[in-house]
């Protein structure tokens, strides 16, 4: 890209790296950093943070074959995901209780806008407008927002729950192919599988000020 090869394309350039961060804990940025730096085309940079935290990333799994009461696998899987999200919220609250701090703000992150709609259809969450507040029926007083990973860029929340970590076309990473027309205006990064999805997952992980909870199939 122009940014990673700026000096080569434009002549003299001096690279100044911002390496200190105060949003994320060192543990979170180490995990996210190791993940994104597997791409050899990335500019190498290791961030440093004064914040420390135990259990920076917590993974919750669900049964993707669950069919629910009506025997429908799709709606059953949606319910299993929503229930796993609710369980993650309960664990988050337990962490806060043990640390003697308030729950703060919670961000639910999906890969697509309809991930939030699917949560609502289960009856465990209420969600009326995309990119806005989402209500956990069991814990109605919590400050929870739903967004896509793309729309969350630049924002920060106390804790983040990534809800769509499944190996499917509309999962995270997404396997949806770009429109071929885009190839004429955007040079795709083929240096590593799912290069753009890796960058987007890094964005998702680093929206948190504390912990990241990930929801994925067993």
Regions found by a protein language model. Give the residues of each.
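Helical mechanochemical/support elements of P-loop NTPase systems and associated helical scaffolds
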Residues: 24-25, 77, 81, 115, ...
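Conserved helicase/translocase motor-coupling segment
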Residues: 64-155
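Conserved helicase C-terminal RecA-like lobe
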Residues: 102-105, 150-206, 210-217
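Short glycine-/polar-rich loops that comprise or flank the Walker A/P-loop
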Residues: 10-15, 54-57, 142-144, 155-159, ...
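Conserved catalytic network of the ASCE P-loop NTPase/AAA+ motor domain
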Residues: 7-10, 52, 99, 139, ...
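Conserved RecA-like helicase ATPase core segment
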Residues: 1-66
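Conserved nucleotide-binding/hydrolysis micro-motifs of P-loop NTPases
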Residues: 1, 21-26, 64-66, 113-115, ...
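Structural preference for long, well-ordered alpha-helical segments in enzyme cores
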Residues: 18, 31-32, 85-89, 201
């Amino acid at each position: 890209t122009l940014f990673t090869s700026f000096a080569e394309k434009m002549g003299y350039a001096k690279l100044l790296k911002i390496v200190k961060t105060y949003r994320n804990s060192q543990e979170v940025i180490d995990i996210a950093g190791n993940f994104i730096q597997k791409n050899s085309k990335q500019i190498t940079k290791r961030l440093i943070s004064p914040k420390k935290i135990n259990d920076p990333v917590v993974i919750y799994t669900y049964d993707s074959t669950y069919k629910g009461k009506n025997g429908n696998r799709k709606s059953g899987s949606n319910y299993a995901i929503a229930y796993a999200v609710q369980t993650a919220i309960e664990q988050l609250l337990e962490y806060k209780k043990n640390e003697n701090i308030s729950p703060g703000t919670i961000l639910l992150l999906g890969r697509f806008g309809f991930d939030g709609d699917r949560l609502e259809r289960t009856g465990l969450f209420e969600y009326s407008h995309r990119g806005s507040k989402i209500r956990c029926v069991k814990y109605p007083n919590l400050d929870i927002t739903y967004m896509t990973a793309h729309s969350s860029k630049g924002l920060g929340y106390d804790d983040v729950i990534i809800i769509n970590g499944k190996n499917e076309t509309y999962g995270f990473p997404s396997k949806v192919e770009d429109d071929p027309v885009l190839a004429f205006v955007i040079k795709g990064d083929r240096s590593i599988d799912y290069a753009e999805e890796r960058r987007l997952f890094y964005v998702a992980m680093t929206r948190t000020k504390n912990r990241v909870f990930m929801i994925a199939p067993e």
